[in-house]
Swiss-Prot record:
CDD domains: DHQase_II (cd00466). This is 3-dehydroquinate dehydratase. The active site is at Y24, H102. One of its GO terms (molecular function) is 3-dehydroquinate dehydratase activity. Catalyzes a trans-dehydration via an enolate intermediate. Homododecamer. Pathway: Metabolic intermediate biosynthesis; chorismate biosynthesis; chorismate from D-erythrose 4-phosphate and phosphoenolpyruvate: step 3/7. The record marks R19 as: Transition state stabilizer. The keyword Amino-acid biosynthesis applies. It comes from Chelativorans sp. (strain BNC1). The keyword Coiled coil does not apply.
């Protein structure tokens, strides 16, 4: 049976393809989901792909992944920069590996985006590589499992 990786997406990622394509690219979240499913299949993994604009829902899904999943790819969106609650949820499911993904290079953007509250508790972070960052995160998780 294939191991399941949760791919969790935070606020405003449902607007990909329309929202600031110069920063986030032209792919939609559905396109990224298809890429993730194809990459996961090639790695012998299954994907549980979800998106929410609500912090509490993301926390519930992190807890669920802690019970049922083999790892998490997390694009917390702006919550990554502000949410102690996401930090605590990730810490609560340790040692489950979590890879944080950001489509844009957060270090080349506004100063308030340079640091994430979640970075200290994730296994690694991929940022600035666009949608391929999700595939790279799945590869990194597969190597750890």
């Amino acid at each position: 049976m294939a191991k399941t990786v949760y791919v969790l997406n935070g606020p405003n990622l449902n607007t990909l393809g329309k929202r600031e394509p110069g920063i986030y690219g032209g792919k939609t979240l559905a396109d990224i989901e298809a890429d993730c499913r194809a990459a996961a299949a090639g790695l012998g993994l299954e994907v549980e792909f979800r998106q929410s604009n609500h912090e509490g829902m993301l926390i519930d899904w992190i807890h669920e992944a802690g019970e049922r999943g083999a790892g998490i790819v997390l694009n917390p969106g702006a919550y990554g920069h502000t949410s102690i609650a996401l930090h605590d949820a990730i810490r609560a499911v340790s040692p489950l590996p979590v890879i944080e993904v950001h489509l844009s290079n957060i270090h080349a953007r506004e100063p308030f985006r340079h640091r994430t509250m979640t970075a200290p508790v994730v296994a690694g972070m991929i940022c600035g590589l666009g949608p391929i960052g999700y595939t790279l995160a799945l590869q990194a998780l597969a190597a750890r499992l």
